[in-house]
């Protein structure tokens, strides 16, 4: 929980889908996976497809929200990074099995699925300890 109401999400928000024109205007392309989803979907995918440190990822979450995240918000979005990473890792395994090379993303998604799941679970455990 903690993500708020569903909203329109791109669901494939990673660097190649962000274009910037000569005037500096940004465009988000490739909308075939778009739909109504938890707001964590897009930021989770964006971080999962980047090579950020944990601190950088937490900064991205704060920028996305427009404020310092509460403990509940942070664990929710960290959990979404883990889920998005796991989803894309499984997709990458399938692509590799079909002889389509995924590259370094496969390792990044594997690493992030484990790392961010652990971070989110630790935050849930901390809350239970103080409840």
Residue ranges and their predicted role:
Residues 90-131:
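ATP/Mg2+ or Mg2+-diphosphate-binding catalytic cores
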Residues 2-3, 32, 46-49, 78:
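Generic anion/oxyanion-binding catalytic loop in active/binding sites
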Residues 40-69, 82-100, 119:
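Active-site activation/catalytic loop segments of kinase-like enzymes and analogous catalytic loops
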Residues 1-41:
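Active-site acidic catalytic loop and adjacent metal/ATP-binding pocket
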Residues 75, 79-83:
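Start-of-helix signal in alpha-solenoid helical-repeat scaffolds, especially tetratricopeptide repeats
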Residues 69-75:
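Juxtamembrane loop-transmembrane helix junctions in multi-pass integral membrane proteins
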């Amino acid at each position: 929980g903690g993500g708020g109401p569903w909203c329109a999400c791109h669901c494939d928000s990673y660097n190649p889908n962000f274009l910037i024109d000569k005037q500096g205007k940004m465009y988000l392309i490739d909308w075939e996976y778009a739909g109504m989803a938890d707001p964590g979907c897009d930021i989770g995918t964006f971080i999962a497809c980047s090579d950020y440190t944990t601190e950088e990822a937490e900064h991205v979450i704060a920028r996305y929200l427009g404020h310092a995240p509460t403990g509940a918000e942070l664990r929710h979005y960290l959990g979404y990074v883990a889920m998005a990473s796991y989803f894309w890792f499984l997709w990458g395994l399938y692509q590799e099995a079909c002889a389509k090379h995924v590259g370094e993303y496969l390792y990044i998604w594997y690493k992030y699925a484990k790392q961010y799941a652990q971070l989110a679970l630790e935050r849930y455990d901390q809350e239970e300890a103080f409840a």
